[in-house]
Amino acid sequence: EFTRVRRGAEQRRVLVVGAGEAAQLLIAQMLRSSAGYLPVGILDDDETKKGTLIHGVRVFGPTRDVQEISSALDIEEIVIGIPSATSDELSEIVHYCESLGLPLKILPGIDDVLDGEGSESRRPVLVVGGGGYIGTHLVEILLNSNYRVRVFDKFVFGRGVLGDLENHPDLEVIEGDVSNIYLLTLALRDAQAVIHLAGLVGDPASSIDDNLTQHFNIVSTRILLESVKALRIPRFIFASSCSVYGASDEKVNESSQLNPVSLYAESKIDSENEILRSAGEHFHPTILRFATVFGHSRRARFDLVTNLFTAQAFNDGKITVMGSQQWRPLIHVSDIAESIVRVLDAPIEKVSRQIFNVGDDDLNITIGELAILVARVVDRDKTGSKVDITVDDDFDDTRNYRVSFEKIQETLGFRAKIGMEDGIREMAAALEDGVYENPYYHGLYSNVQMTKLIKDEFYSKEYRETHLSILLRDLSRDDDRVTE
């Protein structure tokens, strides 16, 4: 990977080999960032590109001219950006370059392939959003399943969420977000699959700022999608949501009409459509529509209905229900992670271009029934206590859906392993053991608070200078804007 140079340090003059999409993305980010790299020339064996400019950088000729061009341009480092090249082609290019004695980087990391060690099974799985509620759980399961894992995440609340996993020899961590093309390119190098969990999650968080939601849930997904396609990474797993079904009186499945009632759901549908349209010979996406998640994770959340009810019952002795008749499909966070691994392990032709609802038919429940269940479990486990339930059925929550999970069960043999009572008891035990350092209502455990922190950064001048966003070009905002 690239060695970062401090801001203000003299820029290193870089010659880029390759003029395709991957190299173009990298050149754009080099020019935009303060990493200390200055692309001054490009080599490509396509004669029609000779003399053309890419982001203002000239294509000087074929790769065999590397010695002559490097000398003429005072090159200090060479970057090979041809992910589609064969091993023989790369070996020839590397041979030209190594004779110069200059530092040489290859995008993606094909070094292991040239050494005969780059088997598919040991190439990393990239988890975008690997520091989140689901991501931290998934990373642990992948590592335990002998995968090499690379995490790409903003870590808004700090990298402590990974805990002892950071010391695992098969884990690599890159801190940043998808719209930083330089860091994204590093994160994608030599990946065998990409699991996209990042973005603003949930209706409340996504309703804070429309531009913010569109950037992180739509624009950033497009950037990631185009980069994955350019690098010919075959497997792409996208985390969608059963909230795309909105309000429905019928039990819905993957073929049912979508009825979004929030910007969050609309953003998921937009990304689903774009991803599936991009499927092809070298790109095999899978869409996973998650049920509402519950359970303990390294990156805890108490803005999820089951976790919130459990914390209220345990700490306050009462549960407040805002609308009791709506149906929700539920699934434990560890089962979500297991479903992703199940897709990753499946033959690619079995999951390519497929949409799966992820949950279990036995875990469809109304909010009112859930509150009663939580109260009963916590009441029973806390001897001598009584949990009260307050219901406000005047609350207008248009989300109401029961979901069929027959397809994922029949296709991949997936069923939830952890039931509601066990998950509730797990959360209550963690609360009793003092696992969570702050009260359940602390902003640390809420995606709304995380979104507010990201919003401040999003509108800053520094973010605009180092991240790609079509939206930011059109927004006329003060650089020191703060959250209202």
Language-model segments: residues:
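N-terminal Rossmann/SDR dinucleotide-binding element
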Residues: E120-A193
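A solvent-exposed beta-alpha-beta segment
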Residues: F2-L114
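Active-site Tyr-X1-5-Lys
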Residues: A247, N259-T286, F314-N315
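Conserved Rossmann-fold NAD(P)-dependent oxidoreductase catalytic core, especially the SDR/UDP-sugar
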Residues: H196, R222-L263
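C-terminal substrate-binding subdomain of Rossmann-fold SDR/epimerase-dehydratase oxidoreductases
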Residues: V321-E484
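Conserved beta-loop-beta element that borders a ligand/cofactor-binding pocket
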Residues: S241, E272-S297, N307
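Conserved catalytic-site region of short-chain dehydrogenase/reductase
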Residues: V113, D203-P204, F238-K251, L263-I269, ...
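NAD(P)-cofactor binding segment of oxidoreductase domains
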Residues: H95-E98, L104, V194, I208-F236
